[in-house]
Structure formats: C-alpha cells, structure tokens
Amino acid sequence: MNPQLTPDGRLRHLLTLDGLPRATLTHILDTAESFMDVGEREVKKVPLLRGKSIFNLFFEPSTRTRTTFEIAAKRLSADVVNLNIATSSQTKGEAILDTVDNLSAMHADMFIVRHSQSGAAHFIARHVAPHISVVNAGDGRHAHPTQGLLDMFTIRRFKGEFHNLTVAIVGDVLHSRVARSQIHALTTLGVPEVRVIGPKTLLPTGVEQLGVKVFHDMAAGLAGCDVVIMLRLQNERMKGARLPSAQEYFKFFGLTPEKLALAKPDAIVMHPGPMNRGVEIASEVADGPQSVILPQVTYGIAVRMAVMALLAGGAST
C-alpha cells in the first residue's frame, strides 16, 4: 500500500510522484484546473481551508516554491506560518523531529517541507499525528512532486494530451530532484517517449531503467520533440568540478534558437527555475514565443492549491 494514500484511496501526504496511480495525478490536475479562475477574481480567495494552520518549513533557500505555496494557502483561506530557519532553534542544534513535534503542539494541520537531505519529508511524515499532512517541497536530489505536477499541468494546458508527445529533459539530471519527479509523472501519464539529454557526467547511472531514452547530443535528442524542459546546473549539489566551464556547457547543451529549431515548430520550452541565462538557456529562447516559463509559475499556484485542498479536505483521488 502506498503510504501517501489512505486505505480508501484518499491523499494523505504528497512525498513523491513515484508509485502514485495515473488516476490520482489526473485528479490533482483536474482539481487545479478548477482553481485557475481564483486568481482572476476581485477577491482572490475561497474558504476551503479556513481555520487550517499550514507551516512552511524551508530548510533550503527558495523563492518561487515557498512564495507560491504561501499564496496558494492564503487563497484557500488557511492561516500560514513561515518558519525562519535562520532565526529558529534549528540554528541552536535542535533536531528536526523536535522542531516538528513542537510545531505540531501548536495545532498544525499541514507541513510544507523543503530540505537538503533526501528523505526528510518522508521521515517527518512517518512521525506526525494522523491528522497532519506533509507535502514534500523538495528533498535533496530525490523528489519535488509539486514541481512535477505543475509541469504536467503546463504540458496539458498547451498540448492537450500526453499520449502522443515526445518530451526531452535537458541538462543536469544527476542532481535534479525535479527531473526525477517529471520522469515519474510523464511515464505514469502515458507519454510514449521521454528523453534525457546531457553529458555523461550529469546523467545518473542506469537512468534508462526509469523508461527514458538517453542522448548525449542535442541535435539528435531534440529532433521531433514537442516539449523541451531545461534544467539548471545544480552547482550547490556537485562534489568537485564536472564541467570545464559554463561557456563550454552552453556551447554543447545550452538551448539556443538554432538548437530549438531542431524540435517541432510548435514545441514549447519549459524551465523549473531559477534560470541561468547563458548557461543552460539563451535569453532569446527564455523570452521567446515558444517559452512557457512564466505560465509555469502562474500554474504552480493552482496546482499547489489543489494539492493542499485534497490533503486537507480529503477529496477522493
């Protein structure tokens, strides 16, 4: 049984997309669609989470993810508490579980957790009270499920269906928790061909076992693609130099207008952010007509609203 689901199939935690059935992913995306108009209203709120307390526990820096979770929770009328790690008892050596236990004693209903250690969100989920839900907002290299979901939502909005697409994920797959979540979601939702493109040093050993095709050449990898997802170099997770220089990387694996022309004419370009312009993507592409990078950010609010609403409301998946 999947620990993220209750015995009757309801979402209890969101820790990873690996192992979640297609019906669950589709239901989250459908629920997100129903929240898309909230941001366009004069009063950008719905009362679904009124009286609920949501704690953002970000042990790693974040701009888009933390902010969109906060906006999403407030649009659901929840009370949001952002824990400032720099001034918290964590800096005094308090164990993460003690931090969580103390916050639980303050009648928390949900924890949004980002941590540098893979498995941190799973660890917390195993120790919280039954009424508390945990959302993994990124744990080490392991997973970033809400980013994976908002990327699927973006693809569905621009491409309609998944069953006839070729999707390429380009760059530092080895250190990317986003890539792992994207691959699990794409294969679960029925994308027939998922490609990863990058230098051998930045692709995990045995990545083919996840059901992807591997390319070390941009021209071959981008040919005929409907969706191109660029990843940044995760310099903060690298142990020692793996590349000669950022300029060298851009030469071979940076997405330029010339390289994008190898994909289908109506291909869309995505990036989970933050972008390193001139390293993995040229500004002409990032700001160009095929880029859907800013819509990704907008859609992230609706997707995170959907996740929190399903967790707190217990809507069947």
From Swiss-Prot:
Keywords noted in UniProt: Pyrimidine biosynthesis, Transferase
Task: Show the catalytic activity.
Answer: carbamoyl phosphate + L-aspartate = N-carbamoyl-L-aspartate + phosphate + H(+)
Taxonomy, top ranks, is:
Bacteria, Pseudomonadati, Pseudomonadota, Betaproteobacteria, Nitrosomonadales
Q: Which GO terms fall under biological process for this protein?
A: 'de novo' pyrimidine nucleobase biosynthetic process; 'de novo' UMP biosynthetic process; amino acid metabolic process
- Subunit composition? Heterododecamer (2C3:3R2) of six catalytic PyrB chains organized as two trimers (C3), and six regulatory PyrI chains organized as three dimers (R2).
What family does the Swiss-Prot or TrEMBL record give for this protein? Belongs to the aspartate/ornithine carbamoyltransferase superfamily. ATCase family.
Q: Which GO CC terms are listed, alphabetically?
A: cytosol
Per the UniProt entry, the Enzyme Commission number(s) are: 2.1.3.2
What GO molecular functions are on record for this protein?
Answer: amino acid binding; aspartate carbamoyltransferase activity
Entry binding sites for L-aspartate: K92, R177, R232
Q: Which InterPro entries match?
A: Asp/Orn_carbamoyltranf_P-bd (IPR006132), Asp/Orn_carbamoylTrfase (IPR006130), Asp/Orn_carbamoylTrfase_sf (IPR036901), Asp_carbamoyltransf (IPR002082), Asp_carbamoyltransf_Asp/Orn-bd (IPR006131)
Q: What does this protein do?
A: Catalyzes the condensation of carbamoyl phosphate and aspartate to form carbamoyl aspartate and inorganic phosphate, the committed step in the de novo pyrimidine nucleotide biosynthesis pathway.
The protein's annotated pathway? Pyrimidine metabolism; UMP biosynthesis via de novo pathway; (S)-dihydroorotate from bicarbonate: step 2/3
Q: Which cysteines in this chain are paired by disulphide bridges?
A: none
Q: Which HAMAP family match?
A: Asp_carb_tr (MF_00001)
Q: What protein does this entry describe?
A: Aspartate carbamoyltransferase catalytic subunit
Amino-acid positions noted as binding carbamoyl phosphate in the UniProt annotation, renumbered to this chain: R64, T65, R114, H144, Q147, G273, P274
Q: Name the source organism.
A: Thiobacillus denitrificans (strain ATCC 25259 / T1)
Q: Among its keywords, does the record have Oxidoreductase?
A: no
